[in-house]
Design a protein with these regions (language model features):
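Alpha-helical and His/Cys-centered functional microenvironments
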Residues: 7-9, 161
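Compositionally biased, low-complexity segments enriched in small residues
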Residues: 2, 12, 26-29
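A beta-strand edge to alpha-helix "cap/lid" segment located at domain peripheries
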Residues: 25-65, 72-164
Length: 164
């Protein structure tokens, strides 16, 4: 009987400790003030605009700066490319953009202000490597991480929006 009381008390203690630990782990990360959130949102929107400019001007230095070393992107076709592959493709000039613009961007902030996700629309037009005109509209989702004081895009995906 003494053993069962000790076991029951030990089990009760472990259950309470587990419950407290679970509640502690479920707490949100450090809260971000509204001013910090607004600054992060503005910064991510600016980076999206720079990304569009990179394609318009074939400026790989922008992408070198804003894409993380392990960056991966999935295009509407399902084709996947890394940072190195995306920059190499822009350097070869396979496509020449006359339009490259992101719009309707919504930014969400997570992880105490260290992670952001932006969702928006993207319109691009120009000529492909064979001189054939193209025009595409897509909706994108990008994941940004704050590391060493700078925002870097680690992953993105675009889905085609049919033109009417």
């Amino acid at each position: 009987m003494v053993h069962s009381q000790i076991f029951a008390r030990g089990l009760l203690f472990l259950s309470i400790a587990f419950a407290c630990g679970s509640v502690a782990l479920a707490q949100p990360a450090t809260a971000v003030t509204p001013a910090q959130k607004a600054a992060i949102e503005a910064g991510i929107k600016d980076l999206s605009a720079q990304w569009s400019t990179a394609y318009l001007k074939n400026d790989t230095s922008i992408l070198e700066r804003i894409w993380a070393p392990d960056f991966v992107y999935v295009e509407p076709s399902g084709h996947r490319f890394t940072k190195e592959e995306g920059i190499a493709a822009l350097k070869t000039g396979g496509e020449r953009h006359t339009v490259s613009e992101a719009s309707s961007i919504d930014v969400r902030v997570y992880g105490g202000g260290t992670v952001a996700v932006d969702i928006g629309d993207y319109k691009e037009a120009g000529k492909d490597k064979d001189g054939k005109p193209f025009e595409r509209v897509s909706r994108f989702t990008n994941v940004w991480v704050l590391k060493d004081g700078a925002w870097r895009c680690v992953s993105g995906h675009a889905s085609a929006i049919p033109t009417r």
